[in-house]
Design a protein with these regions (language model features):
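Glycine- (often His-adjacent) and acidic-residue-rich active-site loop
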Residues: 54-92, 108, 220-221
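Short helix- or helix-capping micro-motifs
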Residues: 61-63, 156-165
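Hydrophobic, secondary-structure "cap" segments at the distal end of domains
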Residues: 146-155
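Acidic, divalent-metal-coordinating active-site segment for phosphoryl/phosphodiester hydrolysis
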Residues: 165-171
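C-terminal long alpha-helix characteristic of the crotonase
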Residues: 20, 123-128, 178-227, 240, ...
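Glycine-rich beta-to-alpha active-site loop
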Residues: 90-137, 166
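Conserved CoA-thioester-binding segment of acyl-CoA-metabolizing enzymes
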Residues: 1-55, 88-91
Length: 260
């Protein structure tokens, strides 16, 4: 059985982690499936938003224990290859040209926090707990660190990477790791509301804006960075979509890309 299910509703694709019996912990097979799913969906013109969801009581518990047991006997070269696959999954999710929403219905541990951090928007139920537990096992949250630190900030990361404390959904909201905390009954409606906003924005502007965010965030404001921002807006203004958006605004009509 596949470790994922992929469903579609209009222009929204939902990728659901489907290993509830192990709290959606990932192994090498699941890592490959997630990587392939986001790579393929990101290339589809009929998909404008991707929701990452999970079955069962937990969103993702990080690495599967059986997979970790097998890693105990790996050589350094094998560990490099294995960690490289995990890093590729995280980067594929982070760089997916389509906007992504993490629908967090339960606890998120270790590598699972990387999945959340690599998504553009994160919505969690108020009962969800979070934990970067790697140091308790003598390990490091290495491959997920670029994404988690960007999401929660370096100061919060110092605390939660080093102490491996469990923190609540409200704390995740306070430090900026998630954007919304809702009750279980409100989760789907909030995700649908955000997805609706994303699919009705300019379908070419959204991935361009996502790339802009990744290029600009955390960078020094240099002449080169300013030139990049000038070039990006100039390119968009003369594009077919940019012209349509501006004309629709000036003429007080809806743009032709809207989905009802």
């Amino acid at each position: 059985m596949s470790d994922l299910t992929v469903t579609f509703e209009g222009a929204v694709a939902t990728v659901t982690l489907n290993r509830p019996e192990v709290r959606n912990a990932f192994n090498d097979a699941m890592i490959l499936e997630v990587t392939q799913a986001f790579s393929q969906l990101g290339a589809r013109d009929d998909v404008r938003c991707i929701v990452l969801a999970a079955e069962g009581s937990a969103f993702c518990a990080g690495a599967d224990l059986n997979w970790m047991r097998s890693m105990a006997d790996y050589t350094h070269a094998q560990n490099l290859e294995d960690a490289g696959r995990l890093a590729t999954m995280m980067r594929t999710l982070y760089e997916c040209p389509k906007p992504t929403i993490a629908r967090i219905q339960g606890d998120v541990y270790a590598g699972g926090t990387g999945l959340v951090a690599a998504c553009d928007v994160a919505v969690a139920v108020d009962t969800a707990g979070f934990c970067l537990s790697e140091v308790k096992l003598g390990l490091l949250p290495s491959t997920i660190s670029p994404y988690v630190i960007r999401a929660m900030g370096a100061r919060a990361a110092h605390r939660y990477f080093l102490t491996a404390e469990r923190f609540s959904a409200l704390e995740a909201l306070r430090i900026g790791f998630v954007h919304e905390v809702v009750t279980a009954g409100e989760l789907d409606s909030k995700v649908a509301e955000l997805a609706h906003a994303l699919v009705n924005a300019g379908p070419k502007a959204v991935p361009a804006c996502k790339k802009l965010l990744q290029d600009v965030a955390g960078q020094d404001i240099t002449p080169e960075l300013v030139a990049l921002t000038v070039e990006s807006i100039a390119n968009v203004r003369v594009s077919t979509e940019g012209r349509e958006g501006l004309q629709s605004f000036l003429n007080k009509r809806k743009p032709n890309w809207l989905i009802n």
